[in-house]
């Protein structure tokens, strides 16, 4: 297969010896044609850089976009177009240990159990700058972070909806999947999971605090998801299996809408079919963002009661 190199944003291809496929095709919002501001969000340990893409006018609802593990905020640029069409200001955030935001003391990912605090700070930033409601977008581990935010944030009542792409719904499932891929004996894999969640495992894992994997099992906690959620997940995802997303949607059909893609690797659903991805997101979000009626309030044109 031959691919044309259209542009080099950084580095020297003559000296490159290795590379990888990324789903991000733009280095920043400006390269995608969006006017953006560089902003800093106060978080634990300092300031986290973010891109702010204003929708214009007085946008009441902001989309806060959370990239996945090992990725950067570039991953979220693909969602800015649909957000703007819906009148949403977009805030593409960084979080602890992602290489942009301040590192945590232990320098380790918390799999969502700690990173959600930085998204909470982003919500506070949005509210201080005119937002009244929030939509969360999350990719991969960013989806796990969004779920934790919707569960634990002091602003959770202001989170109108979530759009999750290839989210981690159950870390035990993902860790077991990777143990199998890497031919790690199941007993060793289970021991590793135990050490993640046990105080005595800190010396082995380097984590400042245990990670409560059960608290992040949204298959078991399916009925506790009370924020309308769209999950987009490829059946061919090689990194985060789509099975838990399916089960979550089945167990909480009232709140969770599930859309599958084919032939897309992890978080690359948009890359396989951007038109469908964007259409799904816009069609699902529009009714979620519609004005809420107060009890007894009639929409214009409704017949009066008893008429």
Where are these regions (language model features)?
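Short beta-strand/loop motif that positions the catalytic acidic residue
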Residues: 224-226, 231-233, 237
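Acidic catalytic loop of the alpha/beta-hydrolase fold
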Residues: 235-240, 267-268
């Amino acid at each position: 297969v031959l691919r044309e190199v259209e542009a080099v944003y950084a580095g020297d291809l003559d000296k490159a010896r290795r590379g990888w496929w990324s789903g991000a095709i733009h280095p920043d919002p400006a390269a995608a044609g969006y006017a953006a501001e560089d902003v800093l969000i106060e978080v634990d340990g300092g300031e986290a850089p973010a891109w702010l893409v204003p929708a214009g006018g007085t946008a009441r609802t902001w989309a806060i976009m959370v990239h996945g593990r090992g990725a950067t905020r570039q991953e979220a640029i693909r969602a800015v177009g649909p957000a703007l069409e819906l009148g949403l200001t977009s805030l593409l955030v960084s979080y602890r240990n992602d290489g942009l935001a301040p590192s945590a003391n232990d320098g380790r990912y918390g799999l969502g159990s700690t990173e959600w605090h930085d998204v909470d700070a982003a919500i506070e930033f949005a509210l201080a700058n005119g937002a009244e409601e929030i939509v969360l977008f999350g990719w991969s581990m960013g989806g796990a972070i969004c779920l934790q935010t919707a569960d634990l944030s002091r602003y959770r009542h202001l989170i109108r909806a979530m759009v999750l792409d290839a989210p981690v719904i159950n870390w035990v499932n993902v860790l077991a999947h990777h143990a199998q891929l890497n031919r790690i004996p199941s007993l060793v894999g289970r021991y590793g999971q135990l050490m993640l969640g046990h105080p005595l495992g800190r010396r082995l894992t380097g984590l400042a605090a245990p990670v409560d994997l059960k608290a992040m099992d949204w298959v078991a906690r399916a009925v506790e998801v009370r924020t309308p959620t769209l999950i987009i997940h490829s059946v061919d995802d090689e990194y985060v299996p789509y099975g838990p997303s399916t089960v979550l949607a089945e167990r909480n059909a009232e709140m969770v809408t599930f859309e599958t893609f084919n032939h897309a690797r992890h978080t690359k659903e948009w890359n396989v079919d951007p038109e469908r991805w964007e259409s799904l997101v816009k069609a699902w979000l529009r009714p979620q963002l519609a004005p809420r009626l107060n009890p007894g309030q009639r929409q214009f044109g409704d017949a009066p009661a008893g008429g």
